[in-house]
Design a protein with these regions (language model features):
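Metallocofactor- and cofactor-centric catalytic cores in central/energy metabolism, strongly enriched
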Residues: 1-151, 155-299, 303-387
Length: 387
């Protein structure tokens, strides 16, 4: 099986061909938004960080920004900074250039004379990049070039019974084809980490799985909190999930049955052709998806039993539910229904194949529901993490 995409100068393959207007901090976010609105083919996002952060939080922010620019769905990036933030322009540019050699421009609002002049300059840069991007021709690539991120949010019991197993079957097929699948949400490994650890390819990966789950809980204990106070969420409980351990046993199904080859820290660059890997992310959906996209995922596959509209500005998000009522009620948000597994109408293998076909169609350019609606939520994790 193959898909059509865009080869980048750094060797990676994109499934979208966009220009990113990257705000280096919250103070540059609205300027970046104005720029992107004036250039068809450009995108931006709401960056609430970038200044007044402790060092580990600032590193998370830097990794996400650099990863967004390096993501192969991006042709090139125009970085917009205010000029006095902690995430200084030279630091942001250096972080991006360490990950990729794609086109890169910079605009500092305070240096060019304010918002209007910054917009004028950046719009010109962005239009030049969009024109260059439009000249690229799609090429055919094997699935080994694909990095798929997996996520679940607004879970109910059907997530663990149908949607996540279907995603896991799809994940196994990607791995078998030589591609990469990312299993995320460390908070939802708790109580099931021993099951994941048994699938580790070596002792280092085995120990890292225990390390990230222990560290996640320790972050909460340090401020007198217990992750179980916020997870499962009220929506999870209303849907029928009773404990974090129960939720975790459903969450890990997204990783299928493949060996776990590596564990990556939050938003670090994931190598292609890696098979199944784990990324240390919170359970908060936008913050977790942000990390996987920063890691290089071109497509996100996201299950939700209760229903979720979350999208992303850079990577298409394929929504999956195992709840036929949710699919009927939120059909404008959900792309794929895995409920036939519960009713014995299809096997998990059949659903995995169907879902992979949808992922390939998405990679080839078909819009997801979240893309069509223009949903571009994003968030960045912090030291005291989201549950």
């Amino acid at each position: 099986m193959t898909f059509y995409g865009y080869r980048r100068p750094d060797g990676r393959v994109g499934v979208r061909n966009r220009v990113l207007i990257l705000p280096a901090s919250v103070c540059a976010t609205d300027t970046a938004r104005i720029i992107a609105q004036q250039v068809e083919g450009a995108i931006s996002f709401n960056n609430q960080q970038g200044c007044s952060q402790v060092a580990p939080d600032q590193q998370f922010t830097m990794d996400v920004m650099a990863g967004y620019a390096a993501n192969p769905n991006i042709y090139g990036t125009v970085v917009v900074s205010l000029g006095c933030e902690n995430c200084q322009m030279d630091l942001v540019v250096k972080a991006i250039e360490e990950r990729t050699n794609k086109p890169l421009k910079r605009v500092i609002i305070q240096e060019v004379g304010g918002t209007l002049k910054a917009v004028e300059i950046a719009v010109r840069y962005a239009k030049e990049m969009v024109a260059e991007a439009s000249m690229l021709q799609k090429e055919e690539f094997p699935l080994s070039e694909l990095i798929v991120g997996t996520e679940c949010g607004g879970s109910d019991p059907t997530s663990g019974l149908a949607a996540n197993p279907a995603i896991g079957a799809m994940s196994d097929l990607v791995v078998q084809a030589g591609g990469t699948s990312i299993l995320s949400e460390t908070s939802e490994f708790i109580g099931a980490e021993h099951i994941l650890a048994r699938r580790a390819i070596n002792k280092e990966v085995h120990d890292r799985i225990y390390e990230i789950t222990s560290r996640f809980e320790a972050h909460f204990h340090a401020v007198g909190e217990d992750v179980r106070q916020g997870n499962p969420s009220p929506g999870n409980k209303a849907g029928g999930i009773t404990t974090l351990e129960e939720k975790s046993l459903g969450c890990i199904h997204k990783g299928g049955h493949s060996p776990i080859n590596a564990v990556y820290d939050y938003a670090k660059q994931v190598e292609s052709k890696q098979g199944l890997v784990i990324m240390d992310t919170p359970g908060n959906d936008p913050a977790s998806v942000a990390a996987m996209v920063a890691g290089g995922a071109q497509v996100i596959v996201f299950s939700s039993g209760r229903g979720s509209p979350v999208g992303h500005p850079i990577a298409p998000v394929v929504k999956v539910t195992g709840n036929k009522i949710t699919f009927a009620n939120m059909e404008d948000n959900i792309d794929f229904c895995a409920a036939p597994l519960i009713y014995g109408e299809k096997t998990v293998e059949q659903l995995g194949t169907d879902l992979l076909n949808m992922v390939v169609e998405t990679a080839c350019g078909k819009q997801t529901k979240a893309e069509a609606l223009g949903f571009v939520e994003t968030a960045i994790a912090r030291v005291c993490n989201y549950v």
